[in-house]
């Protein structure tokens, strides 16, 4: 029997507000433990919450960008549970009437088809504190308590771990592009839980689901869902009874581990938050927020394909972050060579950034300087290989490519007569390579070209070198 997965994701995005959701404490990441706190976020007796207007604005903005309907009347609710990281012993969240409902994200499958993944709801809530486990015991840091979140709950429309990854990637790019969250998974500002069950292909009856936590990267998400799918299929095939439970992804051992049996909604005893009034959202406010939404990543990618004539894949990669998209567009316009710009950004520049773990905004050179480098190569002033060396220098120093080329004497040699002398010398000193070439070994020419480039310290025009080596070898 063939099975398919039924997957839904719950994504928590930390909002990029300056202050917490119900008080004036800073949301800045880091800081000494328990220094970004006050009586409100510590839940001290007598303290009263006040809803941060910017949080509501960001909730509306996210909902509009994700094709949701905005609930014009919504409320906050108490979710009751006892855990050390929850200082009030309840979380102020939204239950029955969230701020947004019924949205979707469109993803592109491997075969090029597009698929809509439904979004059931988006609700606002506060984050909990953070537990720090030591040999001596467990400590609690409440700096994160009260930091505003939106939870985006998808419908169970996802059928493979790969689809789940595409959904999360698209969601991340949208949220970061509208600047409601920085979506830094390594800092916990974007967190994802997954719900998965399996059912026979063609069936409409979902199986017993498991919730998986601790999936803190795209790779972890895909691996955890794949593992859990295999575990469910094996259990069902053997006739075992699966129970609804919450499991944790163990990255070190590549397995999911049981945490607890799954709670039900009534275990949390939800009821309206009496210290906060019902929220009324006007049509005028919604339209004001709508005007602040920029061109979304998929819209920008489509425009790049049409305007700059770059491949669809390039456009999708370049629009994963708005900083990269902006850098590309500015460089492409200045260099008048969009494909070369795309190649440099997706290739050598991305490699250098990954090596140093930095982002586009941290680069020491600007789009104008990269455009200058591309123009130097296209004009034949320097070769592509020399261009890579110049880029390395630009990356370290931030100097302009022209200055680097002049300082280091890297101007390309286009003098055929001078290059021909070197070619003849190399051929004369390597008779075996000529013999190999005559015997049908085409790679022998590549060897000779490499020797010429080495002799000229990479300054000879590669096209001229290739032409002259081929001509001289055929004369022998």
From Swiss-Prot:
Coiled coil: none
Gene Ontology annotations of biological process type: glutaminyl-tRNAGln biosynthesis via transamidation; translation
SMART domains: GatB_Yqey
Top enzyme category: ligase
E.C. code: 6.3.5.-
InterPro entries per record: Asn/Gln-tRNA_amidoTrfase_suB/E, Asn/Gln-tRNA_Trfase_suB/E_cat, Asn/Gln_amidotransferase, Asn/Gln_tRNA_amidoTrase-B-like, GatB, GatB_C_1, GatB_Yqey_C_2, Gln-tRNA_amidoTrfase_suB_CS
Keywords, comma-separated and alphabetical: ATP-binding, Ligase, Nucleotide-binding, Protein biosynthesis
PROSITE patterns per record: GATB
GO MF, any single term: glutaminyl-tRNA synthase (glutamine-hydrolyzing) activity
Catalytic activity as recorded in UniProt: L-glutamyl-tRNA(Gln) + L-glutamine + ATP + H2O = L-glutaminyl-tRNA(Gln) + L-glutamate + ADP + phosphate + H(+); L-aspartyl-tRNA(Asn) + L-glutamine + ATP + H2O = L-asparaginyl-tRNA(Asn) + L-glutamate + ADP + phosphate + 2 H(+)
Pfam families noted in UniProt: GatB_N (PF02934), GatB_Yqey (PF02637)
Quaternary context: Heterotrimer of A, B and C subunits.
Alphabetical list of NCBIfam families matching this protein: gatB (TIGR00133), PRK05477.1-2 (NF004012), PRK05477.1-4 (NF004014)
Record function comment: Allows the formation of correctly charged Asn-tRNA(Asn) or Gln-tRNA(Gln) through the transamidation of misacylated Asp-tRNA(Asn) or Glu-tRNA(Gln) in organisms which lack either or both of asparaginyl-tRNA or glutaminyl-tRNA synthetases. The reaction takes place in the presence of glutamine and ATP through an activated phospho-Asp-tRNA(Asn) or phospho-Glu-tRNA(Gln).
Similarity comment text for this entry: Belongs to the GatB/GatE family. GatB subfamily.
Name of protein: Aspartyl/glutamyl-tRNA(Asn/Gln) amidotransferase subunit B
Organism: Clostridium botulinum (strain Langeland / NCTC 10281 / Type F)
């Amino acid at each position: 029997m063939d099975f398919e997965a039924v997957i839904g994701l719950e994504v928590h995005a930390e909002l990029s507000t300056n202050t917490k959701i119900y008080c004036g404490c800073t949301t800045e990441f880091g800081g000494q433990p328990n220094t970004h706190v006050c009586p409100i976020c510590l839940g001290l007796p007598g303290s009263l919450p006040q809803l941060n207007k910017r949080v509501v604005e960001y909730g509306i903005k996210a909902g509009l960008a994700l094709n949701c309907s905005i609930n014009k009347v919504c409320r906050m609710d108490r979710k009751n549970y006892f855990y050390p990281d929850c200082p009030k012993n309840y979380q102020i969240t939204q239950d029955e009437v969230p701020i947004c409902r019924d949205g979707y994200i469109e993803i592109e499958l491997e075969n090029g088809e597009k698929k809509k993944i439904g979004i059931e709801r988006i609700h606002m809530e506060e984050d909990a504190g953070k537990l720090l486990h030591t040999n001596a015991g467990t400590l609690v840091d409440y700096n994160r308590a009260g930091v505003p979140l939106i939870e985006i709950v998808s419908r169970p429309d996802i059928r493979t771990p790969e689809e789940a990854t595409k959904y999360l990637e698209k969601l991340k790019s949208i949220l970061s592009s509208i600047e409601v969250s920085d979506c830094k998974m390594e800092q916990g500002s974007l967190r994802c839980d997954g719900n998965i069950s399996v059912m026979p292909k063609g069936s409409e009856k979902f199986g017993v689901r498991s919730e998986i936590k601790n999936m803190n990267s795209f790779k972890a998400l895909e691996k955890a869902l794949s593992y859990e799918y295999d575990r469910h299929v094996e259990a069902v095939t053997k006739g075992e009874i699966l129970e609804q439970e919450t499991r944790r992804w163990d990255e070190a051992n590549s397995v999911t581990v049981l945490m607890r049996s799954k709670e039900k909604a009534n275990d949390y005893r939800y009821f309206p938050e009496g210290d906060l009034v019902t929220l009324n959202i006007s049509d005028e406010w919604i339209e004001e927020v709508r005007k602040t939404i920029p061109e979304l990543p998929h819209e920008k990618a489509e425009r790049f394909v049409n305007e700059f004539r770059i491949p669809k894949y390039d456009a999708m990669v370049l629009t994963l972050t708005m900083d990269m998209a902006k850098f590309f567009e500015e460089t492409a316009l200045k260099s008048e060579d969009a494909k070369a710009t795309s190649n440099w950004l997706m290739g050598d520049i991305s490699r250098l950034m990954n090596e140093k773990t930095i982002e586009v905004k941290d680069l020491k050179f600007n789009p104008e300087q990269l455009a200058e480098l591309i123009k130097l190569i296209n004009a034949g002033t320097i070769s592509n290989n020399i261009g890579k060396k110049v880029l390395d220098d630009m990356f370290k120093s931030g100097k302009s490519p022209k200055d680097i080329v002049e300082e280091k004497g890297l101007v390309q040699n286009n003098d055929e007569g001078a290059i021909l002398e070197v070619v003849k010398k190399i051929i004369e000193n390597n008779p075996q390579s000529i013999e190999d070439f005559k015997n049908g070994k085409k790679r022998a020419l590549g060897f000779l070209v490499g020797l010429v480039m080495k002799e000229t310290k990479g300054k000879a025009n590669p096209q001229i070198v290739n032409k002259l080596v081929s001509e001289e070898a055929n004369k022998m």
